[in-house]
Amino acid sequence: MQVRIADYPELRKLCWNRPPEAVLDGADALALYERNWRHVDPEALEANERALIQSLATRYGGGVLNV
C-alpha cells in the first residue's frame, strides 16, 4: 500500500520535513503515526484519514494502533 502525504492533513504535519508529494510505504506510514501520535489532533482527523489509519492498523499492525 502506498500513502501520498499530501492527501492526509495530520500525516502532512508529521512529515513536515518531507515534500508533500512524497509517497510512503504503508508500514512506514503506520510507524510514523504510532511514533508521533502525540502530535496528531484526533479531533482534526478527516473521515478519509481515520479510514486510512484503521486500514494501516489492520494491514500492518494486527488490527491495533499502538499509541
Positions of the model-derived regions?
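A generic structural signal for solvent-exposed, polar alpha-helical segments
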Residues: 14, 22, 38-39, 43, ...
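N-terminal acidic leader/helix
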Residues: 1-27, 31
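Amphipathic alpha-helical segments that form the core helices of the histone-fold
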Residues: 30-40
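Short, charged early-sequence alpha-helical segments and their helix-coil boundaries
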Residues: 42-67
